[in-house]
Amino acid sequence: EKLRPETLKLINETINRLGYLPNQSARQLAGGATKSFGLVLPRLDHGFSLQIASGAHNEARKHGYDLLIANADNDDILQDHYLRYFMGTQMSGVMVQPMASPDWHPAMTKMPVPIVHLDIHCSEPGYYVAADNEAQGRIIAELAIARGAHHIVVVGRAAFMQLTLRVLGIHKALALHPDIKIEVIDAGEWNTAADGY
């Protein structure tokens, strides 16, 4: 940007000819942080996690950042390992989509790099981005009611906070319709196509 175009062209040709690769560790020592974000996902085989990865990648690229993605394989210990790894490499920030139980809370606090928790609700201080799962449940119930449903069945693991909040929204919507039955079947996994995801 500060060089004449012909000088920049000559530099780039020399870089390509010599196969020069900048030392990212040296850049970190000089500048303190990388132009990269880390993203820790619980699994790489779930559509929602893939949408998060795609959206994060697009936004990072749009703003001149790189995105490194780690698969925690539904393992809290591995998730914490990747969080610590990304912290140690001085990322500009880390996003994590934890496997959330109703009693979930952030494992790490007061970190030198901003952490954003995705698809999770928490009252503790921090950065969180999540859908309104209770409103989703209400909308689902309202649609079922509008279509004449007499019985609503929800299949999923009650241990997951998102499902708990959706069921709460369904119950609230059904409060005015006591004749409609709701049944929750605690089965399946959150990340398999066979379970409707």
Language-model segment annotations:
Residues E6, Q24, P42-Q51, I69-L78, ...:
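Hinge/beta->alpha junction and helix N-cap segments in small-molecule ligand-binding domains
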Residues I145-H150, A175:
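Secondary-structure boundary elements
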Residues K35-S36, D66, H151-I152, I180-K181:
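Charged active-site motifs of nucleotide-sugar-dependent glycosyltransferases
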Residues G32-A146:
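Alpha-helical recognition/docking segments in bacterial nutrient-uptake
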Residues I15, A60, H171-L174:
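Conserved hydrophobic residues forming the short capping helix/wall of the S-adenosyl-L-methionine
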Residues L18, H63, M111, H177-P178:
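Helix C-cap/helix->beta junction micro-motif
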Residues V116, A175-L176:
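Venus flytrap/periplasmic-binding-protein-like
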Residues E1-T34:
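N-terminal helix-turn-helix DNA-binding module of bacterial transcription factors
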